[in-house]
Amino acid sequence: MSLAELQAIAADWTPQLLAAAGYTLKMTAVAYIIGAVAGLLLALARLSQRRVISLPALVYIEFIRGTPTLTQLFLVYFSLALVGIVLPAFEAAVIALGLHYAAYMAETYRAGIEAIHRGQHEAAQAIGMTRAETMRYIILPQSLRVILPPMGNSAISLMKDTSVASLISAPELMLRAHDLTSEYYMPMQLYLIVGAMYLIMTYPLSMAVRHLERMAGKGRLSGRRR
C-alpha cells in the first residue's frame, strides 16, 4: 500500500473516529449524571428504616448487579417499543447504562454514608436537625472522601461499557470501527487505534482517581493522628 493510499485512508478515518469518540464522551457524561442522581436516591432508599422503601431498592440493586448490561439495554430498547415507546438509540443507551450504574453507585454512596460515625447522626439530631438536614449538611459532605474514588472508577468503567450501545446501532466508537472494518478490511489496525483512543479518554480519569485515593489516604492518616 502506497503512502498516498495510507494518507487517503487516514483522511477518511480520522473525522469519523473523532466524531464517534465525541459521541461516546457525550453518552458517558449523560449516563453518568443519570447514574449518579439515581444512585443517590437508591442509596437513601436502601438506608431507610422503612422496609416498604428499602426492600424495593435492594431488589432493584440485586437485579441490576446480577444481570448482564446487554440484557438491560435490550430490555429498555426493545421492550419499551412493544408498548409504543420507541426510543432513539442514544436515549435508550444512556437510560440503560445510567440505570445500570445507578445500582453500583448506590452501594458506593451507601458505603460512604455508613463510614461516618453514628455519633455524628446523634449529635445532629440532638441540636434539632432533621434527618434530611443531617444527611445534607453533615453526612454527605464528609462521605465524599470515601465516595469520590470509586465514583471515578465507575466513570471509567461506564465509558468502556458504552461499546455495548453499538448493538442497537448507536454511532459510538466501536460501531464506527466495525463499519470502517467492513469497508476497508483492516480490523487489526482499526481496533488498535480504537483501543488507543479509549486509553486516551480514560487515562485522565485514571490519574484523577489515583489523586483522589492519595488525598483520601492522607485524610484518613491525619484523622488517626488527631
Predicted regions and their residues:
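Transmembrane alpha-helices and adjacent helix-loop boundaries
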Residues: 1-226
